[in-house]
């Protein structure tokens, strides 16, 4: 029996792909189980926050005395915690409290998380005012609390809330349209992670996401301090800080428009090993497909890479996996090596790559000889 390098490579690739698929199936099952049990942990975090608020109120009340504002704050926190716990139970199979901020790709959405944080804070602020209004006995105090909801005092925070919620909706629409238009590649994650808020799908930190989370978080802390100092009105977010948040949101949205891109084939050449003679592309030869965007972000695993297909004429060729320490030598984001099948008819044929995300590249014509 004669040794065939291409057959050996294909056998190794198929065995590796099968093993990787089994591991991936187990990982997906574990991810679903982890997500189903997440609602208990999120509910525990919510009630832990209520306990911390109670301790903070008790410590700061020493010397200053207990006030109606402290009671209203605790009552608002209890109502919020009960609502979040109920919502967590109804969405217990989808991540509990985190269900609304988990995207379609099973990752935490930065835009939804930031918007949700501001929505919860504004809801808590209004509940605090409602609690103080219910406890107020004098008409003058009630009028002062109602005037605390005037737009003139809360224009900054209302503007920020409206823009951030709009950004969350718009980003979902933009990403969906770009995926359908094959201008953005998305692959599903096994489970959401906290790092998703600051990184792209490949796990690399991105400037747009980081600055959006940092600036929005700083503004939220400032608004919380203002609420603690003046609980009789909506936090009056200064316009300078509000504009900073709006600029940060615009930067984040621009980053969403700029990320990704359609994979492209730049050239196709005959692969040449040491000692080979120069010549045309023939059936049975290996060809190198050079370009960009062949491996979608987050698809570096063997189970995802094994889904890549190259169309050579009418023949579909699965890309062989060539492992090396720390990853794979083939395929890579800029280079694919595949054999030309014997079923390809000699003549001019078109080569096209289908990535793991299902996105097709441009067609590139090459000449194949016998």
What is the predicted function of each stretch?
Residues 78-84, 157-172, 216-229, 236-258:
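Alpha-helical membrane-embedded segments
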Residues 258-370:
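Ser/Thr/Pro-rich low-complexity tracts
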Residues 30-46, 106-120, 192-218:
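Loop-to-transmembrane boundary segments
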Residues 99-101, 176-200:
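Juxtamembrane inter-helical linkers in multi-pass membrane proteins
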Residues 46-55, 112-132, 162-165, 209-223:
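Hydrophobic alpha-helical transmembrane segments of multi-pass integral membrane proteins
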Residues 58-74, 134-156, 230-239:
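Membrane-helix interface and helix-disruption motif detector
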Residues 52-63, 90-94, 124-142:
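Membrane-helix interface motif
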Residues 2-25, 181-192:
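Short, charged cytosolic
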